[in-house]
């Protein structure tokens, strides 16, 4: 005999699931847009405000080693702001030299990465489809190992009795080992080796998106290959060049491990200064001021990159 199931078992979904579905229908787009902003607030704005607060404090023999900005005393709120940390950066030429050398090293390293990365990206983009993925894997593969291990490997290659000097001695190019390790040259080599994949990938992405009918049209109109490259291909891959340059330049400015292990006493980059102020001198307020100024310097290329991206979207949109 057929029996009817209780009506309670076939009732429509309700409760939390119904509320969640209604929330997605009404505010789904707003929630999707809000997620990146929440990410930026938690991982960028909030740490920035904490560092900025410390930069306005004074050094103290305490844990943490700085004074509080706001204190309650006799029922009143006392606010003490110390701008002396920022003034100290202008008085001591060490900080100015560190900023200048960091920007110089980052700029030259970025240019070297571009000189190496563009031909490499071109070779990968114009390789056979069967070997393209293998070449991309070879570009990315070093990034899968520890960054510190890769830097130590550079030390083994660049030292006086390392692989490079032994190879040059075997060829008879040099009579005695070259002093490369613990010099500025070693810093450049280490940064270029570490960050060249970040230059290759954006340029490769731009190259495979090129409409090569434009290149063929330029050649048909009598343009030479070199002129076609600089007047057609380079402008079409400008977005990849700028993106790769930002991915190399920004982290290279604050690099610490490579100058510390490969550089010498003359390699005074801002990352090493930050380390000394935080851990050796335990002067967190001054170190925070150094970090704030470095961040403000990096905002300039970031804003320029953002402006270029908006312009590119407007031209293609």
Predicted regions and their residues:
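C-terminal transmembrane helix and the adjacent membrane-cytosol boundary/short C-terminal tail
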Residues: 2-5, 204-219, 285-317
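N-terminal signal-anchor/first transmembrane alpha helix
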Residues: 11-54, 58, 133, 137-138
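Membrane-interfacial helix termini and adjacent extracytoplasmic/periplasmic loops
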Residues: 18-22, 69-74, 151-192, 226, ...
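Interhelical loop and adjacent transmembrane-helix boundary motif
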Residues: 23-29, 59-62, 72, 86-89, ...
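Cytoplasmic-entry segments and transmembrane alpha-helices of multi-pass inner-membrane transporters
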Residues: 32-33, 120-157, 215-216, 229-230, ...
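Transmembrane alpha-helices
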Residues: 35, 137, 141, 193, ...
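Short membrane-interfacial helix/loop motifs at transmembrane-helix boundaries
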Residues: 45-93, 157, 264-265, 317
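Transmembrane alpha-helix signature in integral membrane proteins
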Residues: 92-126, 225
């Amino acid at each position: 005999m057929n029996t009817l199931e209780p009506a309670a078992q076939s009732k429509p979904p309700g409760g939390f699931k119904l509320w969640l579905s209604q929330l997605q229908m009404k505010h789904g787009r707003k929630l999707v847009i809000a997620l990146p902003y929440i990410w930026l607030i938690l991982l960028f704005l909030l740490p920035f405000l904490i560092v900025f607060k410390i930069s306005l404090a004074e050094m103290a023999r305490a844990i943490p080693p700085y004074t509080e900005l706001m204190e309650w005393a006799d029922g009143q709120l006392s606010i003490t702001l110390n701008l002396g940390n920022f003034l100290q950066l202008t008085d001591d030429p060490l900080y100015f030299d560190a900023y200048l050398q960091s920007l110089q090293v980052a700029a030259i390293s970025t240019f070297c990465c571009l000189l190496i990365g563009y031909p490499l990206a071109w070779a990968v983009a114009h390789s056979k489809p069967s070997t393209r993925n293998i070449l991309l894997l070879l570009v990315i593969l070093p990034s899968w190992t520890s960054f510190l291990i890769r830097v130590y490997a550079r030390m083994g290659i660049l030292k006086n009795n390392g692989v490079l000097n032994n190879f040059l001695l075997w060829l008879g190019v040099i009579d005695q080992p070259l002093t490369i390790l613990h010099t500025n040259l070693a810093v450049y080599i280490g940064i270029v080796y570490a960050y060249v994949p970040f230059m290759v990938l954006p340029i490769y992405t731009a190259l495979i998106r090129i409409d090569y009918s434009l290149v063929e049209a330029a050649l048909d109109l009598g343009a030479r290959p070199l002129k076609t490259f600089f007047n057609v291909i380079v402008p079409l891959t400008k977005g990849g060049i700028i993106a790769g340059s930002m991915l190399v330049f920004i982290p290279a400015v604050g690099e610490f491990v490579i100058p510390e292990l490969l550089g010498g006493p003359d390699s005074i980059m801002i990352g090493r200064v930050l380390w000394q102020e935080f851990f050796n001198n335990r002067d967190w307020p001054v170190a925070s001021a150094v970090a704030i100024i470095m961040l403000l310097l990096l905002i300039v290329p970031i804003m320029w990159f953002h402006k270029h991206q908006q312009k590119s979207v407007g031209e293609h949109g």
